[in-house]
């Protein structure tokens, strides 16, 4: 498959061990192009590489307490391009945190666990299936006009 057709995923997490393990899972079990970033600032600086989806940690304060948190990073990503799907990832399983992420236009919210990779993979698949159906619907609607 050509690189042009491959899905490009940005992984953003300040937990180096978790980030590396997630990167390895994606490289071994998918055909995605994977880029990793330890801070929201680095992710924002690389948005010109046009990621297809971003997996973003909610906290992001493990390296630098003054660094942007996940919500601030999410807001800047959406300012750059509102169409980039962002899946929030967190060790917090509080419903308020998930709702807050969705209010900031996250596509999904996944709690960090031993099944995170599978949930993330399903969320990415769901997004691209939804996008395909939406394009088909728009095509049919344009034919009816």
Go through each PLM region and give its residues:
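Non-catalytic signal-transmission and effector/linker regions of two-component phosphorelay proteins
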Residues: 1-10, 15-23, 133-145
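Two-component/phosphorelay signaling modules centered on CheY-like receiver
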Residues: 16-38
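Acidic, metal-coordinating helix/loop segments flanking the phosphotransfer/catalytic sites
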Residues: 36-53, 57-62
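Hydrophobic beta-strand core positions in alpha/beta domains
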Residues: 55, 85-88
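Conserved phosphotransfer microenvironments
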Residues: 55-75
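Alpha4 helix (beta4-alpha4-beta5 surface) of REC/receiver domains from two-component response regulators
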Residues: 68, 72, 79, 92-110
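Receiver (REC) domain switch/output surface
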Residues: 119-132
């Amino acid at each position: 498959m050509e690189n042009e057709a491959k899905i490009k995923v940005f992984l953003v997490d300040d937990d180096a061990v978790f980030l590396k393990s997630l990167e390895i899972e994606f490289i071994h079990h998918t055909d995605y192009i994977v880029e990793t970033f330890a801070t929201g600032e680095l992710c924002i600086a690389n948005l010109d590489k046009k990621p297809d989806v971003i997996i973003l940690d909610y906290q992001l304060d493990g390296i630098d307490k003054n660094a942007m948190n996940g919500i601030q990073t999410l807001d800047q990503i959406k300012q750059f391009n509102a169409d980039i799907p962002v899946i929030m990832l967190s060790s917090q399983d509080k419903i308020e945190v998930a709702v807050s992420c969705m209010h900031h236009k996250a596509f999904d919210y996944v709690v960090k666990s031993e099944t995170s990779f599978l949930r993330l993979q399903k969320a990415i698949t769901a997004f691209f299936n939804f996008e395909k159906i939406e394009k088909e619907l728009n095509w049919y609607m344009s034919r009816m006009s």
